[in-house]
Amino acid sequence: MVGIPTRGIELTEVLEKELFSRTGLRVRKGTIDPTFYRDDQNRVGTRLIQAADIPTPIEQKEILLIDDVIYTGRTIRAAMDALYSWGRPQRVMLLVMVDRGHRELPIQPDFCGKKVPTSKIESISLRLNNVDNEEGVFLE
């Protein structure tokens, strides 16, 4: 499992703990920051860059890429470019908690918690207890 900043990393932690509590299965988890691979940096602004943490070689491994919300698909495309700079996985699957539509690239999640159609001027945020002291999906 590989989380994308910011909430994708926290979501990866939550999912890893839940998977272990239900199955006893431990999975390796990591993080990948797509910032340097984005094609829209001037539009999304700047933020603190997080170092990638890929704990194992990814060659011929199945990778579950995790993010909180999918919108245009640009973050996922950039994250996949960053991931492939570490090697060539056998398969990459995508898990998101919320799909709000409005894709600009042909990228679709393999696993989606909820589809929440929004207008382009609205935004959605995922809040998690371990970070935000509240839990839910919020339309803003």
Feature roles, as predicted:
Residues 1-140:
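PRPP-associated nucleotide enzymes
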